[in-house]
Amino acid sequence: YRITGLVQGVGFRPTLWRVAHALKLTGEVWNDAEGVGTILEGNVDVLDRFEEELRKTVRDEAPLARIDSVELVQTTPALGSTDFVITASRQGTAHTMVTPDAATCRACAIEMFTPGNRRWRYAFTNCTHCGPRFTITRSIPYDRPMTSMASFAMCSDCRHEYDDPADRRFHAQPNACPILSLIHISEPTRPY
């Protein structure tokens, strides 16, 4: 499938991952210069429900995302995938939109104003529902190495959130916390 719209930097791949797992589909999903691509394997009746379930789940769980089109590119014999995974982004000539920055969501605001929370008073708190997108993007596909966050390694707690499908920071590229500034990766300064 080829999916276009506001589908990068909005928690779209994690949302698609959850839909695929809920429907017991296998395959993969990736960002690329045109939007998002996915290969799905599973029962034909379930595959027929995929687009409807994806649109519903995106509407309910990914408030910054917008699907413009879902196109079945081709059907092929099953490859025998045993899981559904988010794979590395693929390069190409850009034909997709960069999502605008979004105001802090309620869940992040609660963290910022809760004493004892590791993000208490941390102004750069964000998740897949809020935070910087356009202002940090250097190139697409939208992945951390293509953003101004590239020179900042995630701490182990941020990495755990990023890798956890149940977390709202699952694959949130600008994920950060106050520890971030302590583990800056040395990189030559680039003028903007």
Label for each model-derived stretch:
Residues 1-178, 182:
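Intrinsically disordered, low-complexity, mixed-charge
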Residues 183-192:
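Single conserved hydrophobic/aromatic residue that forms the stacking wall/gate
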